Amino acid sequence: MPLNIMSGKPLPGKLFATLVVLLLSSISPSLSQLHAAESVALVKEVSAELDLAATKAIFDSHSACFVDARSEYVYYKSHIKGAISLSDSRFDEQFPDFKQKKAIETLIVVYCTESSCGKARRVARKLMKNGYRNVRVYSGGLIEWAHAGFPMEG
């Protein structure tokens, strides 16, 4: 983690990304624009990940829409209680209905089977490309959730 030269304390991710962009802008405007976009994307990607404790706290607060990115077939077998299906493979078909039901500012927590499953991240990116900005990925997935004994249905 980058350190503040003056205090020796770690720099927050967004601050570090901003400092990198400012430094690069003094070198070349086009180079800085490229790195700025990459830095912002990286910060968003990193900050969008939730662990089990954070996900459970959000679940308990009833403040989010949980989205299962797996296929509908496995969704109907079991899913986080209250989650809706918005599968990676059928996103384009299912999204119009989702958009009608969920406001653009809704907090959305997307998950799939486990941490190595890329479906949740792909669905999260697709949601963000369609205007949703309050999107998080629960990286532990359904396996971790089930092992913790948290509410499920299906």
Predicted regions and their residues:
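Conserved beta-strand scaffold positions in the cores of enzyme catalytic domains, especially
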Residues: 49, 66, 83-85, 135-137
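Catalytic cysteine-centered active loop of the rhodanese-like fold, especially the PTP/DSP P-loop
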Residues: 96-145
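Short, structured coil segments at secondary-structure junctions
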Residues: 79-81, 131
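Envelope-exposed proteins and targeting segments
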Residues: 62-63, 71, 82, 104-107
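A mature extracytoplasmic/lumenal domain signature
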Residues: 70-73, 79, 87-90, 112-116, ...
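Active-site neighborhoods of enzymes that stabilize oxyanions during catalysis
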Residues: 150-154
